Amino acid sequence: MPKMKTHRGAAKRFKKTGTGKIVRHHAFTSHILEKKSPKRKRNLRKGTVMHKTDAKRIARLVAYL
């Protein structure tokens, strides 16, 4: 059986932690930032762990992360 191809778009958006969890960036950070508080914008800069069910789908797209 041939190797699976990595979904390049997904590979650029997600990272795997040392424990195997998948991390993603927050949305809502590109524009309309004036009304958002500094605390909210600061927290949006951090990554967040994906939900288990979503992570399973992403793991299929990027099997070799």
Swiss-Prot record:
The keyword Ribonucleoprotein applies. Keywords: Ribonucleoprotein, Ribosomal protein. It comes from the Bacteria. GO terms for molecular function: structural constituent of ribosome. GO terms for biological process: translation. Pfam families: Ribosomal_L35p (PF01632). GO terms for cellular component: cytosolic large ribosomal subunit. PANTHER family: 54S RIBOSOMAL PROTEIN BL35M, LARGE RIBOSOMAL SUBUNIT PROTEIN BL35M. Belongs to the bacterial ribosomal protein bL35 family. HAMAP family: Ribosomal_bL35. This is Large ribosomal subunit protein bL35.
